[in-house]
């Protein structure tokens, strides 16, 4: 985000307060050392006796601005004023009925997208702090929630880019189980076997952390980082990702992917952004609150989990319309995930451990059996629930000769461990994003972002 003058303030006021009351509040703000640049009236007329801007400005001794329609919040003027006056904080001195929860989230989105704090009498939203530390072109992969496929898309994207001779990509990932010191994993050089990851787990590492999955599935260099907590607009409480990103400056790479965690956003400045939206998520999560904030950040939006069993055609159509209304400039690609084992499972009797919902188990079973010549004995959708996963394994382990598992959650310390202890083969499984029809070209959309990131980075020189 652009650096702002944190002491420079835009006040949002209304006509539901008498001017002397509002002026007292403005004076109080300035008594704390802030510089109120402008008063913007955002609605309400009950106590608004005069709309003569010159008279009101003289009373407040401040520039005053009105929208054309006093019954509507002038969102466009809020954004224009932030930019024109280079304010670092928007202070909301309004109240019901002029504003409500939805309106305030809309205002917050505008403020945060423009690098401003948005503050009211009992709330405060801070703009994302991004460190500009990379010496190579970069893109972010962030999401509107957890378990929507960020790591799968990140690995797929890295593999795709790695096929292009112009690029040597790497992935910097932060996770809730990441290392205390940023960790380089040479996915481009080492073979990550179940036994190797089990040894890591036995030493206390979270061997199913995102950067291990990235390294195994993408076969590119990864840097693993940690983060704790995630704010409503994506800021983390603590992370070592900035240090991890800086490490890439000394590596033999020329493109950096910054992978978010859950709905938390990497605090490192990137040239382009890919935002993942889960087709299974409630509509209001995406169109209300800070859903629009994340969607507006995107240059490319990938909607995942668009199987009709998860996201009905009606919902998807509605989602496409609403996302386009929020961010008309972003490319949008709806996708489904399909499993892809990293090793041969031909003629194997398998138990497949996944985070995919039970509603699509029959699709996954058919896909695996038809494409990989195996027999799916059972599928457990409890990879992120250790007790239930343990139960599923115990019920089926005597009937299988291969454990097929995604590399996340309890994949190593439960699924891999139990299978190896029984002398069974363990094969890890990738999830491949596939566009829902030929109208969309996922690979082309991704590579467009990559080349745009390179172009944007080169323009800085």
From Swiss-Prot:
<keyword id="KW-0963">Cytoplasm</keyword>
<dbReference type="GO" id="GO:0005737">
    <property type="term" value="C:cytoplasm"/>
</dbReference>
<dbReference type="GO" id="GO:0016874">
    <property type="term" value="F:ligase activity"/>
</dbReference>
<protein>
    <recommendedName>
        <fullName>Cyclic 2,3-diphosphoglycerate synthetase</fullName>
        <ecNumber>6.5.1.9</ecNumber>
    </recommendedName>
</protein>
<keyword id="KW-0547">Nucleotide-binding</keyword>
<dbReference type="GO" id="GO:0036356">
    <property type="term" value="F:cyclic 2,3-diphosphoglycerate synthetase activity"/>
</dbReference>
<comment type="function">
    <text>Catalyzes the formation of cyclic 2,3-diphosphoglycerate (cDPG) by formation of an intramolecular phosphoanhydride bond at the expense of ATP.</text>
</comment>
<dbReference type="GO" id="GO:0005524">
    <property type="term" value="F:ATP binding"/>
</dbReference>
<dbReference type="GO" id="GO:0006094">
    <property type="term" value="P:gluconeogenesis"/>
</dbReference>
<comment type="similarity">
    <text>Belongs to the cyclic 2,3-diphosphoglycerate synthetase family.</text>
</comment>
<keyword id="KW-0067">ATP-binding</keyword>
<keyword id="KW-0436">Ligase</keyword>
<dbReference type="InterPro" id="IPR016557">
    <property type="entry name" value="Cyc_diphosphoglycerate_synth"/>
</dbReference>
């Amino acid at each position: 985000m652009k650096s702002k003058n944190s002491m420079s303030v835009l006040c949002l006021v209304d006509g539901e307060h008498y001017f002397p009351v509002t002026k007292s509040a403005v004076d109080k703000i300035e008594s704390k050392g802030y510089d109120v640049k402008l008063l913007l009236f955002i609605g309400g007329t009950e106590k608004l006796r005069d709309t003569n801007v010159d008279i009101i400005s003289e009373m407040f001794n401040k520039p005053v601005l009105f929208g054309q329609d006093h019954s509507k919040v002038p969102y466009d003027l809020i954004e224009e004023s932030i930019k024109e006056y280079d304010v670092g904080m928007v202070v909301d001195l309004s109240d019901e009925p002029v504003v409500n929860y939805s309106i305030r989230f809309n205002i917050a989105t505008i403020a945060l997208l423009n690098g401003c704090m948005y503050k009211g009498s009992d709330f405060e939203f801070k703009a994302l702090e991004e460190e500009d530390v990379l010496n190579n072109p970069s893109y972010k992969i962030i999401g509107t929630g957890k378990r929507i496929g960020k790591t799968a898309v990140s690995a797929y994207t890295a593999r795709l880019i790695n096929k292009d001779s112009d690029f040597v990509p790497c992935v910097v990932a932060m996770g809730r189980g990441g290392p205390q010191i940023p960790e380089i994993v040479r996915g481009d050089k080492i073979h990550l076997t179940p036994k190797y990851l089990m040894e890591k787990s036995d030493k206390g590492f979270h061997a199913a952390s995102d950067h291990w999955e990235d390294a195994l599935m993408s076969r590119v260099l990864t840097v693993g980082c940690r983060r704790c907590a995630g704010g409503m607009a994506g800021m983390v409480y603590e992370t070592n990702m900035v240090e991890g990103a800086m490490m890439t400056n000394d590596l033999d790479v020329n493109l950096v992917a910054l992978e978010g965690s859950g709905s938390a956003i990497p605090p490192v400045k990137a040239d382009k952004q890919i935002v993942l939206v889960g087709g299974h998520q409630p509509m209001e999560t995406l169109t209300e609150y800070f859903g629009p904030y994340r969607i507006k950040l995107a240059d490319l939006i990938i909607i995942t989990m668009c199987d009709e069993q998860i996201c009905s055609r009606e919902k998807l159509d509605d989602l496409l319309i609403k996302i386009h209304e929020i961010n008309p400039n972003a490319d949008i690609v709806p996708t489904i995930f399909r499993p892809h084992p990293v090793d041969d499972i031909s003629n194997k009797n398998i138990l497949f451990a996944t985070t995919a919902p039970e509603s699509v188990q029959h699709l996954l079973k058919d896909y695996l059996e038809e494409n990989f010549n195996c027999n799916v004995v059972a599928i457990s959708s409890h990879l992120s629930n250790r007790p239930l996963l343990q139960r599923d394994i115990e019920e089926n382990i005597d009937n299988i000769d291969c454990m097929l598992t995604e590399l996340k959650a309890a994949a190593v310390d439960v699924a891999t461990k139990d299978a190896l202890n029984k002398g069974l083969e363990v094969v890890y499984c990738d999830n491949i994003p596939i566009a829902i029809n030929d109208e969309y070209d996922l690979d082309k959309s991704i590579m467009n972002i990559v080349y745009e990131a390179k172009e944007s980075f080169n323009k800085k020189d």
